């Protein structure tokens, strides 16, 4: 009783009771969304070289921000794949101008995507529905560039073109002679003994032609 009285007395050592040793620890709520390892890798792969902010996106961002970053990362990865395929192919000189313009457009679009992803990850900036839709519309226009590059890449695959040309040349060289079409003989033109005399006869008057005929008969 004495010890209890000492705890509650105004002259005691513990004015409001003896303190306990327990400390307050903050409880963090678990996020309602779950991110798969594949999504995490795609986001990290879609970021600019030397930048790794995927953990920031997954750590303290909302589900909406995570979905936006994932969609942007997928588009960035597609652009990177197309650029890598074009760097690996030899482009004819006649197509250099067109290809360089397409590559510049894709790189500019990828820079916009990178900036948007970094803003989402490192700051409290979140794209609004209208702004994100505008970015997706711009991206849809750039998909036409991807289709053009796909057609051009298919057309200028150098290895296949070289093999095809070599096969055609071999077929032409090794073609048998009997397969060649036979030459059609030309019809010979009529040969006249004295075309000048015939022409002069045609130009004579009818009376003169009769006299010439009579003289020829007398000679015979």
UniProtKB/Swiss-Prot annotation:
The superkingdom listed in its UniProt entry is Viruses
Record PTM text: Phosphorylated. Palmitoylation is necessary for Golgi localization.
Q: Which GO terms describe its cellular component?
A: host cell Golgi apparatus; viral tegument
Q: Where in the cell is it found?
A: Virion tegument; Host cytoplasm; Host Golgi apparatus
Provide the lipid-modification sites (S-palmitoyl cysteine): 11
Provide the primary localization.
Answer: virion
Known Pfam families for this protein? Herpes_U44
Keywords linked to the UniProt accession: Host cytoplasm, Host Golgi apparatus, Lipoprotein, Palmitate, Phosphoprotein, Virion, Virion tegument
InterPro entries membership: Herpes_U44
> What is annotated about its quaternary structure and interactions?
Oligomerizes. Interacts with UL7 homolog; this interaction mediates UL7 homolog incorporation to virions.
The record's similarity note reads:
Belongs to the herpesviridae UL51 family.
Q: What does this protein do?
A: Plays several roles during the time course of infection, including egress of virus particles from the perinuclear space and secondary envelopment of cytoplasmic capsids that bud into specific trans-Golgi network (TGN)-derived membranes.
Question: What protein is this chain from?
Answer: Tegument protein UL51 homolog
């Amino acid at each position: 009783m004495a010890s209890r009285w000492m705890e509650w007395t105004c002259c005691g050592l513990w004015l409001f009771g003896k303190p306990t040793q327990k400390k307050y620890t903050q409880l963090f709520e678990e996020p309602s969304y779950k991110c798969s390892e594949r999504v995490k890798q795609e986001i990290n792969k879609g970021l600019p070289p030397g930048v790794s902010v995927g953990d920031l996106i997954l750590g303290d961002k909302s589900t909406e921000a995570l979905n936006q970053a994932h969609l942007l990362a997928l588009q960035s990865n597609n652009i990177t794949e197309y650029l890598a395929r074009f760097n690996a192919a030899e482009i004819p000189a006649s197509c250099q101008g067109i290809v360089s313009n397409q590559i510049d457009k894709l790189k500019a679009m990828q820079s916009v995507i990178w900036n948007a992803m970094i803003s989402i990850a490192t700051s409290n900036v979140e794209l609004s529905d209208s702004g994100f839709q505008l970015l997706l519309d711009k991206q849809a226009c750039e998909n036409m560039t991807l289709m053009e590059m796909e057609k051009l890449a298919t057309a200028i695959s150098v290895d296949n073109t070289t093999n095809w040309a070599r096969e055609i040349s071999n077929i032409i060289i090794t073609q048998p002679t009997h397969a060649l079409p036979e030459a059609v003989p030309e019809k010979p033109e009529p040969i006249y003994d004295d075309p000048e005399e015939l022409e002069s006869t045609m130009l004579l008057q009818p009376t003169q032609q009769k006299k010439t005929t009579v003289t020829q008969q007398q000679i015979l």
